[in-house]
Amino acid sequence: VVIVDDEILGKPVDKADADRMLRLLSGRTHQVMTGVCLVAEGWEKRFSVTTDVTFKILSDEEINYYITTYKPFDKAGAYGIQEWIGYIGVTALKGSYYNVMGLPVQRIYEALNAKQ
C-alpha cells in the first residue's frame, strides 16, 4: 500500500481517482509498505517493509500523460516506479526499490536463508 498523510492509497478506481492520488503525492514524500508472510512446513515468518519515496512537483501535463499512456489502475498510489513516472518523478528513495515495485525480494531472500 501507499501511505501519505495517514491516508492509505490503494489502486485507483478510475482516471479521476488516479489524478487525485498523483496530485496528493506530487512534491512530497510518502511511504510504500508491503506485508509478507512466508510459510513452510513447521515454519512461518511475518514481516513488513517500508520504503520512503519522494516525488518532484508533477505538472498537470505529466500527470495527464502518465494516466493516459500507462493506465495505472492496477497499482497502489496510481504509479509504477519502474515506469515513466518513476524515471522523471522520483527524486529520492530511502529503502528497497523492489518493495516499491511490489515485492521486497532482498528481505524475502534473507528470511528464507535464515530459515536454513
Predicted regions and their residues:
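Anionic-ligand binding patches
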Residues: 1-116
